[in-house]
Amino acid sequence: MESFEELEKLLDYSFKNKALLTEALSHPSLRQHHEYKANKDYERLEFLGDAVLNLIITEILFNNFKEYNEGNLAKIRSYLVCKETICVVGAKLGLKNYIIMTHGEEIAGGRDNPNNIENVTEALIAAIYLDSDITTIHNIIGKLWAEFIKVKDLTDYDPKTALQEWAQSKDHHIPIYRLIKREGVAHLSTFTVSVKINGYEQTGKGHSIKEAEKNAARELLHKLKLL
C-alpha cells in the first residue's frame, strides 16, 4: 500500500486531521474482523461526499453553462457524478493503492472493485471538506473534474439521448442495444454492447452495461460524424 503522503501530493492538499484521511480509506470489511481493531470505515463519509460532490458540480455548471436550461444542466450533472466518471477520477489518483482492507477483501479483487473506488473517492471528498472548508474542496473538485467539464458538446455527456434524438429527427427506428459479451467475474466484469440503427452498427465496452451502452452510442455518433 502506498503512503498517504503520496496521495496528499496528488491532491495538492495536506490533511490537518490524519484520522479523517484514514477513515476515508478504510474499507467496511475491517470492522467485521476484530484483529484489525477498526472502529470506523468510509461509509458515513461516502454519504456526505456524495452530497458535497453534487453541490459543487451543480454550482460549477450553474456558473459556467449559462446557455443551458435546467434540463440540459441535469443531463451534464448526471454524467459528471455517475459511477463511471467518479471511478475514472479515483483511478487517476491511484486510490486502489491506498485503500485499507482485509486480506480476504484484497484477494477477492477488492482493490479493482469499481464500487470500492467510487465509495473511497466520495469519502475522500467528504474528508477534505470536513478537514478544510467549502472553498478548498470546490477548488480540488474543479481540478479533478476539469477534463470532464470541458467536453465540447452536450451530446458527449449523454450520447444515448443524442443518438435517439437524431434517429427520431430522421424518422429512423430507435437504436437497438444488445449485450454481446461479458468477460471477467462478478465486480470485475467487462461488458461489450452493440448498438444498431438503420444498418449502422457500433460496439462499446464498459464495466457496466449502462457504461458500455453509452460508449457504443458515442462511437456510433462519431461514426455518423454527429460529434
Swiss-Prot record:
Reactions catalysed according to its record: Endonucleolytic cleavage to 5'-phosphomonoester
Full protein name: Ribonuclease 3
Compartments reported by the entry: Cytoplasm
GO biological process, one term: mRNA processing
Catalytic residues, chain numbering: D50, E122
Keywords, alphabetical: Cytoplasm, Endonuclease, Hydrolase, Magnesium, Metal-binding, mRNA processing, Nuclease, RNA-binding, rRNA processing, rRNA-binding, tRNA processing
Organism field: Rickettsia bellii (strain OSU 85-389)
Family to which the UniProt record says this protein belongs: Belongs to the ribonuclease III family.
